[in-house]
A protein has these predicted regions:
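Residue register of alpha-helical TPR repeats
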Residues: 90, 131, 138, 158, ...
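Flexible helix-coil transition and linker loops at the boundaries of alpha-helical arrays
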Residues: 77-83, 119-133, 166-178, 213-225, ...
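RING-type zinc-finger domain of E3 ubiquitin ligases
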Residues: 1-15, 19-49
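"A position-specific structural signal for the A-helix of alpha-solenoid helical repeats
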Residues: 87, 94, 135, 142, ...
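Alpha-helical segment of the N-proximal tetratricopeptide repeat
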Residues: 79-121, 145-149
Length: 290
């Protein structure tokens, strides 16, 4: 699969000379465009420089600006900042998501890093801007996903923790923010769990559960929030069981089951009902196995 995002590490197929991202073309033995055998791959620095200039001029949130015949020297460039919620920051994120879906992770990471850098710069002059903090939290979470996919658990945890730090500063009345924050906390918990640090994993799972419990109090009619709470209860209970706290674990599983059994969904919510039944089946098996 070719990512169809802006070229990253532009590379040329030999002998046909068709050009792709390095990570994309390395998967092929034949050119995806013409079908010719690929005898070698060469970097195309000139094309990559053109792509980089396009990104700097049209895709970055910040850019240098010279008015009229104003002379610019050293670091005295006047920098204009666009609204990060507008197309410039969103463009970089879209490019990153295209690359990520096609497993061109280094490309995705590069674009997200640019976006994070620009938002950080914007925050220097607008530290209390909640929208910027929310956007940075989301971008950092995606950077964590990139590092996790690349097998760099340490960097992934660092990004997830920073994401959670920014998102935790914001009012928890936006469901999208609640979801992003709770997922980042759970992902840290997962990585700690896989590393064998169960106490740390439980701490992060419990924080995620607290965020979701608070949200469901204000949004009790939102079915997905109830399912999220049950999922978090299951994560905490699973760690409790592995720590030898069986009675506490059973209480957690039972509470999660009650949450889902009380949840009634309409016929138009088929996907949520499937998710509810899947989680419920898992929870019941945990009690059957005790």
């Amino acid at each position: 699969m070719v990512c169809q995002a802006l070229l990253h590490e532009s590379s040329k197929c030999v002998p046909c000379s068709h050009k792709f991202c390095k990570a994309c073309i390395l998967r092929f033995k034949d050119c995806p465009l013409c079908g010719a055998d690929i005898e070698g791959i060469e970097p195309d620095d000139e094309l990559q420089a053109l792509v980089d200039r396009f990104i700097d001029g049209h895709a970055r949130i910040k850019r240098s600006h010279v008015a009229g015949t104003e002379e610019v020297t050293g670091d005295k460039n006047k920098v204009i900042y666009e609204d990060v919620s507008m197309e410039r920051g969103a463009f970089l994120v879209r490019q990153a998501m295209r690359a990520f879906r096609a497993h061109n992770i280094e490309s995705a990471k590069s674009r997200l890093s640019m976006c994070a850098e620009d938002i950080r710069e914007e925050l220097k002059s607008s530290q209390d801007n909640q929208e910027l903090c929310s956007q940075l939290g989301a971008v950092l979470g995606m950077l964590g996903d990139c590092c996790r996919t690349l097998g760099d658990a340490t960097s992934a945890i660092t990004y997830y923790e920073e994401s959670a730090e920014f998102l935790s500063k914001l009012p928890q009345n936006d469901l999208e923010l609640v979801h992003t924050l709770s997922v980042s906390l759970n992902k840290i918990g997962d990585l700690r769990y896989y590393d064998g640090d169960l106490h740390s994993a439980r701490s992060y799972y419990a924080r995620s559960l607290d965020v979701r419990r608070t949200a469901v109090i204000e949004h009790s009619a939102v079915a997905s929030q109830v399912i999220d709470v049950a999922t978090s209860l299951a994560k905490v209970a699973d760690v409790d069981r592995n720590l030898g706290n069986e009675s506490v674990a059973v209480e957690g599983f039972e509470e999660a089951i009650k949450c889902l059994e009380k949840l009634k969904l309409g016929s138009e919510e088929a996907s949520l009902e499937q998710r509810r039944l899947s989680v419920l089946d898992f929870l019941r098996k945990q009690l059957d196995d005790k």
